[in-house]
From Swiss-Prot:
One of its GO terms (biological process) is negative regulation of flagellated sperm motility. It comes from the Eukaryota. Interacts with SERPINA5. Participates in the formation of a gel matrix (sperm coagulum) entrapping the accessory gland secretions and ejaculated spermatozoa. Residues 111-134 have a biased composition (Basic residues). Residues 137-157, 174-192, 325-335, 427-437, 445-455, 487-498, 506-529, 547-557 have a biased composition (Polar residues). GO terms for cellular component: extracellular exosome. This is Semenogelin-2.
Amino acid sequence: MKSIILFVLSLLLILEKQAAVMGQKGGSKGQLSSGSSRFPHRQRSQHYSGQKDKQHTESKGSSSIQHTYHVDANDHDQTQKSQQYDLNAQHKTTKSEQHLGRSQRLLNYKQKGRDHVKPKRHFRLIVIHRKGGQVHHGTQNPSQNQGNSPSGKGISSQYSNTEERLRVCGLSKEQASASGAQKGRTQGGSQSSYVLQTEELVANKQQRETQNSHRNKGHYQNVVEVREGHSSKLQTSLHPAHQHRLQHGSKDIFTTQDELLVYNKNQHQTKNLNQDQEHGRKAHKVSYQSSSTEERQFNHGEKSVQKDVPKGSISIQTEEKIYGKSQNQVSIPSQDQEHGHKENKISYQSSSTEERRLNCGEKDIQKGVSKGGISIQTEEQIHGEFQNQVTISNQDQEHGHKENKISYQSSSTEERRLNGGEKDIQKSVSKGSISIQTEEKIHGKSQNQVTIPSQDQEHGHKENKISYQSSSTEERQLNYGGKSIQKDVSQSSLSFQTEKLVEGKSQIQTPNPNQDQWSGLNAKGNSGKSADREQDLLSHEQESRYQQKSSGAHNTVNIEHEVAYDDLLTQQYNEDRNPIST
């Protein structure tokens, strides 16, 4: 037994001598010696200087590294585990030499750049405090250190991880670790001396570090990137005493932590989107409008598009108020079903308005959309008024046809705005909507006066004729898009109004003896009003014709055409009424 113990002790002495010789060689070249791992109870401070080019190092001062290791003396397994590190010391020295040469080239390159920018000296100090674990000196890759050390607590892996973190932040080993001994030589020459303290942190300190990183958003250029090591629990933290210096330090030392800032911004945007979803739960209609508003802001980003969004929402709210009024006035179930159809029509109109704003994105087109919304409101008011006056089922069916016609007109208006996108076409669209409103007023009056089924069929044919005329108007605007054609379209719409007024007047002058007393009273009461409105419309039509820049012959042709068409309609109407009265 004694011989075995002596043999083991002799082997240990031989290994210690070899490690001491290799440590001296590594120390002369500027490396961390591996023989210090045999003394876990010591507290060592080593200074190593690496000089590759004397011209740069003498002018700037040799950069040195100061490491302070606090090692526990209670670890009894370090002597046995240090033998495993000593066996791999030969491989470590070759890799550390390559690593030192690369880092020293970076130091020389940065010093050349600072000769022109920063003539004064800058020294930095790294103090590494380590409590517990093994003491091992050697710059080895962390993945290889995991394979060699099962405990994963080697100082070499910790030092390499610290070095990786410093390189990510734009620092090389020598730039981030200037010696504190050079501090006394410069006597005021160091303007920015940073102290970077690396130590093993607890969970509470990690949480505090995360909060500090969020607070330092304004000074994000000085935030050090925090990453977990492969085989250690080290984390980089700024010293509290020098934190105010780091906030106003140079920009080339600590770079921006882009990943953390982007993550925080994404969280902020997610919170805003969640708030938008909460608003959408409160009001479904407003949430749909706000979602389309977000798409417009992301796609176009123009100020004019965003200004026109609340106009559309205000028009939709006004439509809802009009619906409430019309439903209070009407009590017939068949008319309530017609209101349901109107609601579907207007919802389709609002969705198409959003599509127009997304596709076009121009200010003129949006103004035309707001005008169209106002015309739809006026149409609904008119429908509510004459539904209270009319109680005949056949006329209710005719109202359904009118609703289909108006919806077709609105869809064609959407196509014109999407394809054309010109200001002149939008003005003609708003005029067309006004003409449709006037036509509906005239239809409402004529239906109150007339109760004959044959005349109801005639109204149906007139409606088909007007819808066909509007479709041809759409084709002309899409093909030509000129200003003169649009003025002619407005003239044709006014001429249709005039024809219907003449027709209504002839019906009032030749009443049917078979009509009810209720319809007769309405005819007498409304005859004066319809005549007055007829005169107003005719005077308005004449004024619009005088304002046009066309020739006088063109106006004369239009008037003659309308007079001839009025006479023809009067003859047809008299022929239809004579066999019924006899």
